[in-house]
């Protein structure tokens, strides 16, 4: 499957050129934003960890092993990219135990930067946002055109697609999900089951969003839409009055799309008709998600880009800094700017 099939059309026009992303880990930096005051006491040890070219699950296993606790005793808020330099929180459950020596977990790929005690463990999804510093190298694009496009993105946001990495190489996760859905069976391995269910839901959401990008309605509320605020999981139906809510214009309130699960798609009008049509094209996936016990949830169609700044450390390098809500993909921002080409090493440092 191609990227266009997995995501959908761009909203801002054709790519303005080409660039390389992730030539080195420092080109893709992620800092988890967690708005939780830590007390300094309790049976949970929270760890602020820097990872380089290491996925979150492997980092968790190494930290648990070094602490001498089972893997179920370590928690994290969210998964971060492997091919990146990332900083995120973990928590270890250590009732009645002293702080362990975690140096055995550390090497050039993992460093523990801070340790703080707290009364509660870190819950999945507890982070409010992620801060990104991206360096696009080998840039071949007109700077004034990029500047104008970035100003446009700052004002209108981007389609909140699930990024291509959610679907595996060439959409392999979607193909695997379709295979299981055809048999209406679930993988026994929990991590495989979670990955494929997530890929299926993400693919269906992207199909709905792609249709609304194509007809221009992705950033406009329609009667029957279910609206949600940027940082809220609750939603409400849009009537005529809600469609002109001024908070839509300032990127605070957004139309949403479906994260498929049990029960009919809520909402009404044209939006519901579209979602029903997408579901009818993929009945086995929808039935599979419902039978797996997934609840029907919503995700905003429009992604506001917080604190967006950019500069050019060199003529062929564009550095971007911005903040996105948890669960959103930095690569869909880049996609509205340039086409990415395969990585090749660069020697230029990342300037902050």
Curated annotation (Swiss-Prot):
InterPro entries associated with the record: PsdUridine_synth_cat_dom_sf (IPR020103), PsdUridine_synth_TruD (IPR001656), PsdUridine_synth_TruD_CS (IPR020119), PsdUridine_synth_TruD_insert (IPR011760), TruD_catalytic (IPR042214), TruD_insert_sf (IPR043165), TruD_pseudoU_synthase (IPR050170)
Gene Ontology CC annotation, any one: cytosol
SUPFAM superfamilies: Pseudouridine synthase
Domain TRUD: 157-303
Stored CDD domains: PseudoU_synth_EcTruD (cd02575)
EC number(s) given by UniProt: 5.4.99.27
Residues at the catalytic site: 81
Catalysed reactions, as listed in the record: uridine(13) in tRNA = pseudouridine(13) in tRNA
GO molecular function terms listed in the Swiss-Prot or TrEMBL record: RNA binding; tRNA pseudouridine(13) synthase activity
Keyword tRNA processing: yes
Protein's UniProt keywords contain DNA-binding: no
Pfam families: TruD
Gene3D superfamilies: TruD, catalytic domain, TruD, insertion domain
PROSITE patterns in the cross-refs: TRUD (PS50984), UPF0024 (PS01268)
Disulfide bonds: none
Top enzyme category: isomerase
GO BP terms in the entry: tRNA pseudouridine synthesis
Keywords: Isomerase, tRNA processing
Record family assignment: Belongs to the pseudouridine synthase TruD family.
Purpose: Responsible for synthesis of pseudouridine from uracil-13 in transfer RNAs.
Family matches, as PANTHER family: TRNA PSEUDOURIDINE SYNTHASE D
Protein name: tRNA pseudouridine synthase D
Species whose genome carries this gene: Pseudomonas entomophila (strain L48)
Gene: truD
